[in-house]
């Protein structure tokens, strides 16, 4: 591996991780909101999501690799899987924990359901949602790297295996350091968005003291 090839490996790892996390964030929050508003979806999808969350997602990696090859897609799918469930389960908990009396009172003033959602329900649910966002951020780099260790011919996990076998621990530690920085960057960005969106929450006030 030359410097150019190593740079491509790092870029690929970042792309897999960030893309998978963003997709999981959109899907997880979307399903969480939908399930919280629908009793039918709550009875059908929630138990399914809980059962899948208890299944080691990495066990699916060989299947995805056999279906989609060694390209980008199976790695992104693994990242989506390991990030999706913390997000969706915390979103369901967040939106189902809100007081119905408060939302009904606000609607009684003439507010529409859409306005009630953005004014009352979403702000109140965001603190718990961010718990899922941050937990998923921790999982993202782990999921992408393990998927590459299991089956890949290009990614950073594969690169670390190769340079370790070639007795280059310096390059292996450089890869591990990059993974740490990547994970901290994603986590830090989520934390920054948390401070911007919910500065009023007690957890933010304690952090900022």
Predicted features by range, described:
Residues 95-101, 105-125, 165:
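Short helix-to-coil transition segments within interhelical loops
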Residues 35-40, 68-70, 82, 150-152:
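Short helix-capping/hinge motifs at transmembrane helix termini and TM-loop junctions
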Residues 77, 81, 114-146, 179, ...:
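Transmembrane alpha-helices
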Residues 157-194:
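Hydrophobic alpha-helical transmembrane segments of polytopic membrane proteins
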């Amino acid at each position: 591996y030359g410097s150019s090839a190593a740079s491509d490996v790092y870029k690929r790892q970042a792309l897999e991780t960030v893309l998978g996390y963003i997709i999981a964030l959109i899907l997880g929050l979307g399903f969480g909101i939908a399930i919280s508003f629908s009793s039918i979806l709550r009875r059908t999808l929630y138990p399914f999501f809980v059962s899948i969350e208890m299944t080691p997602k990495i066990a699916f990696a060989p299947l995805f690799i056999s279906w989609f090859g060694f390209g980008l897609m199976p790695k992104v799918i693994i990242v989506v899987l390991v990030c999706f469930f913390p997000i969706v389960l915390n979103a369901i908990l967040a939106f189902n924990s809100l007081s119905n009396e408060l939302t009904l009172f606000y609607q009684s003033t003439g507010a529409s359901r859409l306005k009630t959602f953005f004014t009352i329900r979403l702000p109140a649910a965001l603190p718990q949602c961010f718990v899922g966002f941050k937990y998923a951020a921790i999982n993202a780099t782990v999921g992408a790297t393990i998927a590459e260790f299991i089956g890949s011919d290009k990614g950073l996990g594969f690169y670390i295996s190769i340079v370790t076998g070639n007795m280059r621990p310096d390059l292996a530690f450089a890869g591990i350091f990059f993974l740490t920085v990547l994970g901290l960057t994603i986590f830090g960005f989520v934390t920054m968005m948390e401070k911007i969106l919910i500065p009023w929450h007690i957890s933010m006030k304690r952090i900022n003291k």
